[in-house]
Amino acid sequence: LVTLRYDVTPELFLYLFFICILYLISITDIYDQMIPDSALLIAVIVRLLWFFVTEPFGWRGLLGLIGNGLSVSLPLLLLVLLMEKIRDMEMMGGGDIKLLFVMGLYIGWANNLLALFLGCLTAIIYGSLKQRKEGKEVYIPFGPFLSLGAVFALLIGDGLIQWYLSLFI
């Protein structure tokens, strides 16, 4: 599907790498309840190297790239810290916030916001069904749902966002 969306272009290889990282993160989160910092760091390094090789925009472009990473992850981090202080319990793991930063580097802020929405929606549906089946509170690893949202946003996010905005313009 990614090849159909991006054809055989240099970006295809970047996005295939990104999907492999998301797969690794998802499997690790499912089995170990953690998102490995090493996978996130490798993804950041590859994306920065890709930027410096392919983007001629210099510092302004680099600030835009970093802004894409921070635009969703930083406000969510602040919200999570506030909610954890109010509720006195862990609301979301730090790996999920870092994953959102990395996702923003690859798919941009708008698609990252879409991926977060889709990740939350699918996690809520899955968690509700699992809790109903088991009859008790259940642990839901969020990384796989964020990854699913990121792949969906990578494939059709731009078109979906354009369509949504056209409803208001």
Please provide the spans of the model-predicted regions.
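Interfacial loop-to-transmembrane junctions
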Residues: 94-95, 130-152
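Hydrophobic alpha-helical segments
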Residues: 119, 124, 128-132, 151-158
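C-terminal domain-closing interface element
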Residues: 148-169
